[in-house]
Structure formats: structure tokens, C-alpha cells
């Protein structure tokens, strides 16, 4: 029997998580464990908690919320505390409310759950559902249908990537899906805003917010294809070295030392 570990960054109460769990339990004869944050941890990136203790709070059978833990905490602690004799065959992080594309991957708690898994040697996928502001509620039907196929593919054929690599998968907004595209991550144009306010005691505070979801115009990027109605699958590697720049930096350093 296969074993699956599930986490997310929208908290243990999120709709995307609940529907993912329901589908996996129905479609796969697998032992499923869920460890999710107790509260929403969107944009927490790959942070782990080192300054205070964490505890599992049981929600249901093999279902735990991690008290004030991040997605990376959830995966790390699950692998080291809950799995005694055998590690999971797959870690799934999601389904996130909102896309995780381009450099937003570096901010994403959803992607961080998958990152922590592959750092620990476990194959992983990150799932995110794009939606438009006009949509009153998210429709996960297409996401669940395609996730089922991807998980089945992994179990039948093995994981397609190497060590410290995961699949970042984004599903388009509610519409007829045009297909699936394997593509690169886009390039984000960042224009964050900081909104200033004064609290009742006269102290200034700020709310951070992204003004617009703007990206560079690249036809073959995840965001461009996602907006056109395609499911995007981007292989992500954790090796951040810019190998093609090493000679340049070596020459630069040598020139500065002469």
C-alpha cells in the first residue's frame, strides 16, 4: 500500500485541502496522513520554527494540525515524528487558493512544503488553483481530476525528477481546460504596496499588499499559459547556483584584486 503525506499553507480548514483529501481517499488505496498549519501561512516561504516548541493537535484519524507551524515545519516534523518504520511515497502540498507562479514560488508556503519534502528525499508536488476576482467560489473539479491522473502516473511509472526537484502545478480558473503544458516559471514584475494606518494609541502600522499580478510578456511562461486556460507543470530544482556566471565572477574578482 502506498503512503501519502499531505500539507498546505492555507490551514487545516481550507476547502482545497479537504477536497484533495476526499478525492485521494476515494480514488487510491493508500495510507494518507495530513499535517497542516493551524492557521493560514500564505507567503511564509520555506521558514521553519526554531524559537519555540511545536505540537501536533489531532483533528481526525491520521489528521493533525501543527500549532503555529509552517508548511515546512509540518513536513519536517511529520517525517521525523510520525513515520517510524517507513517514509511516505509522495508528499502533496495544496490545493492552494491562488496561483503560485514565477518568482512567487520563492514566497509560497505551498511550494515550501514540497521543497522540504524533496530536501528530505521524498518525491513531492505542489498544487495551486488560480482564480479570478469575479469568482465567488473556487471550483476544484478540474484540479482534482488532473491531480488524480498525475498521482496515478507517479505510482505507476515513478517520479519523473531527480533528487531535490519537485513539480509545481497550477490549475487555471473555472473554465474549459485547453490542455496541459510543461513550461518554465515566468518573471514577475513586483509592485508591492505598504498601506499606512494609525492605531487607537496613535502608533503607525502597515499592511503589505501586492498591487497587481504583473508579469513580463513571455508566451511560454507558466503565468501566460495559465491565463490562457492551460494547466501548467513546471519542474523546479533547488540548486540555485548560476553555473553560467561562475567564470564571469571569477574574472571580476581577479580584476578587482590586480
Predicted regions and their residues:
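Hydrophobic/aromatic ligand-binding patch that stacks against planar heteroaromatic rings
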Residues: 113-118
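Glycine/threonine-rich flexible loop motifs
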Residues: 99-108
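C-terminal accessory domains and tails appended to enzymatic cores
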Residues: 159-162, 166-258
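Short, glycine-/small-residue-rich phosphate/pyrophosphate-handling segment
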Residues: 125-153
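A cross-family phosphate/adenosyl-ligand binding-site feature
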Residues: 4, 20-81, 86-87
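Short, glycine-rich nucleotide/cofactor-binding loops
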Residues: 6-13, 104-105
